[in-house]
């Protein structure tokens, strides 16, 4: 409701109003009345909490509307910036709960030193956390469901620890271990390079140094350009 069109024939209207009148603008694959993506720019001055999002099936079992799959694209980072993505060793749900309890859960997570242009795809169920010193674009399925696993024992202004969702997260986590969670890709001058493709979004990166045409109008859904 707070996003207002600034030019063209819809100038002055909210995005919600425009989409209510013209749901076809979102294409044929979107649920009517629901903008399908959240796109955030996150500038982390300190480490954010370790968390996980359930997939659609797990979310419904847990009483949520839908799950959340997302991705990160690093825009900038400090020299010592790090993040967590996925498990680096096999653990069971009971071991996970014990590691949350004793504060050692980070020992089970794959930690990455990151730099500009790094990409991480985060399917629902993958444990993750953004460390301090990261400025990134987060593209995600529209959903508010987040299960906080660990918050480094920080307290709020009232001296209370933030709520953790240990049991819900145990049900949502994908305990599969992979060798590498960073997306490997090679930029190509003035051409699209696909860096993520899932049921909820497809993301490509362009490395542009000359005029380039992007055929957005030929697609069967909307296109968001981040420059």
What positions do the PLM features span?
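C-terminal amphipathic alpha-helical segment
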Residues: 147-222
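Intrinsically disordered, low-complexity linker/loop segments enriched in Gly/Pro
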Residues: 76-116, 121
């Amino acid at each position: 409701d707070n996003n207002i069109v600034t030019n063209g024939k819809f100038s002055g209207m909210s995005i919600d109003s425009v989409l209510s009148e013209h749901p076809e603008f979102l294409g044929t694959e979107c649920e009517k009345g629901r903008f399908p993506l959240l796109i955030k720019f996150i500038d982390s001055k300190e480490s954010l909490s370790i968390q996980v999002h359930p997939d659609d099936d797990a979310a419904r079992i847990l009483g949520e509307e839908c799950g959340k799959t997302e991705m990160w694209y690093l825009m900038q980072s400090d020299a010592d910036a790090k993040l967590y993505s996925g498990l680096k060793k096999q653990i069971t749900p009971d071991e996970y709960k014990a590691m949350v309890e004793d504060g050692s859960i980070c020992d089970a997570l794959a930690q990455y030193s990151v730099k500009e242009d790094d990409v991480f795809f985060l399917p629902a169920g993958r444990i993750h956390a953004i460390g301090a010193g990261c400025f990134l674009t987060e593209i995600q399925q529209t959903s508010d469901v987040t299960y906080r696993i660990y918050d480094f024992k920080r307290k709020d202004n009232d001296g209370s620890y933030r709520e953790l969702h240990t049991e819900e997260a145990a049900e949502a986590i994908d305990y599969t271990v992979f060798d590498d969670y960073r997306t490997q890709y090679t930029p190509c001058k003035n051409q699209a390079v696909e860096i993520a493709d899932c049921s909820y979004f497809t993301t490509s990166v362009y490395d542009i140094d000359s005029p380039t045409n992007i055929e957005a109008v030929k697609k069967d859904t909307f296109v968001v350009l981040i420059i």
